[in-house]
């Protein structure tokens, strides 16, 4: 295997994906793949279900979560994709999710540094960094990249799948310090090409807009590309970035204890939801 999808939202990301977890895992298995990941935004509602189904289907589960992270005094966040190396890493993700959902706090780089056993992947796409690249503000860009040197190890997302994202993707070609960290990721929101229509309707509700407007934003979401489609899309381009997706998941070995510990996060979320009905 030379590629693993590391950016997959499920239907637990409210109105942002049509992906049913059971269908997703079984589809991965039908493609002859042995690993799959989940990265809902700032929530872990589907994590345990995902883990159980993966174990039933004999597919390796990689539990992740996307998080808005604020740097220094910046009021606009970057997106971090965080992957649990093990159960300790999963607990770190739970703590971050609780910090956001229950305590209504912003996640900072300090919180990431304090999170044990997680693998961070930084995304500059659809963030204020695009503006800095456009303005060619090299001083500020260098300052941001230097900030990440506090992390023991991190990767950087590259997503060349749509032309509208060329600004960030082309910037990477000027950054030798980031090239060795690039990992290929695609924003998977639905399983098959035929599911696009349903996703567009769902996402239109999420954005309080029309389906026509969503269709004009061709870069919003994609289906789960097969390995053949990845090869057709990129050929030998980004080959190392593709392989780094496997490098990431090779560091993840999740085993959840078969006891009540796993339900603490679920119970807290249920109480929170009931109090806010």
Model regions and ranges:
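Conserved active-site carboxylates
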Residues: 1-11, 20, 24-35, 59, ...
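Catalytic metal-binding/acid-base residues of hydrolase active sites
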Residues: 42, 68, 189
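Short acidic/histidine-rich active-site segments
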Residues: 181-194
